[in-house]
Every structure is written in C-alpha cells, then in structure tokens.
Amino acid sequence: MARISGVDIPREKRVEIALTYIYGVGLTRSQKILASTGVSPDTRVKDLSDADVQKLRAAAETFTLEGDLRRQEGMAMKRLQDIGCLRGRRHRMGLPVRGQRTRTNARTRRGARKTVAGKKK
C-alpha cells in the first residue's frame, strides 16, 4: 500500500478513487493532484512507481489534509462557541446550524428519538 498524508491508500483501486480515502480529498481535488503531477487517473495504485508516489505525496502536502484539517475545523467551531454567536450555540446544542427546520426532520443532527411515555387513561 502507498502511504500518503498518513493514510494507507488501497492498492487495487484506481489512483483517482484511492486518493479520496484521505480526509479532505474528494474527487475534484484528487483530479487536480493527478493533473499537477501528470499521473494518469486510470492507473492502479499497485502499478505506481516510487517516483509517482513521491510526486503525489508532494502535491498532496500543498493542501490542508487529515489531522490538520480536522483540527482547523474543530478550532473554527470552538471559536464560534466561545464568542457565543447563534451558530456556536447551535453547534453546542447539537442542532442544525444553517437555518433548517427542527420541528420535524433534523434526525441526523439531533440523534435518535427519545420516547416519552403516553398519557394514561
């Protein structure tokens, strides 16, 4: 397995898809990395030469990826919470941040339903 940005990318997949296993690299960024290095997107990871892997590693390091990106996102959320703005409070309460409705839906953000006992007759 080739190791890029601290992630073992799968050997059997095409390079274009394998790069998306790195946190912060989607299909578009993967294509940009491949275009800048001149590696064919259709090549399998197992067929890459060591020089190609080094080129990919160098190109990937120009972006904020993996742990640094997670830390950056966490710090941005913490900053919002510290200044006490609405977005920060919504993050803290585990509710949708961008104005979505919560009377119905929002199950992903709020978690599973907490069942309340019905009224006895």
Curated annotation (Swiss-Prot):
Residues 99-121 are annotated as: Disordered. GO terms for cellular component: cytosol; small ribosomal subunit. Residues 100-121 have a biased composition (Basic residues). InterPro entries: Rbsml_uS13_C, Ribosomal_uS13, Ribosomal_uS13-like_H2TH, Ribosomal_uS13_bac-type, Ribosomal_uS13_CS. HAMAP family: Ribosomal_uS13. GO terms for molecular function: rRNA binding; structural constituent of ribosome; tRNA binding. The gene is rpsM. Located at the top of the head of the 30S subunit, it contacts several helices of the 16S rRNA. In the 70S ribosome it contacts the 23S rRNA (bridge B1a) and protein L5 of the 50S subunit (bridge B1b), connecting the 2 subunits; these bridges are implicated in subunit movement. Contacts the tRNAs in the A and P-sites. This is Small ribosomal subunit protein uS13.
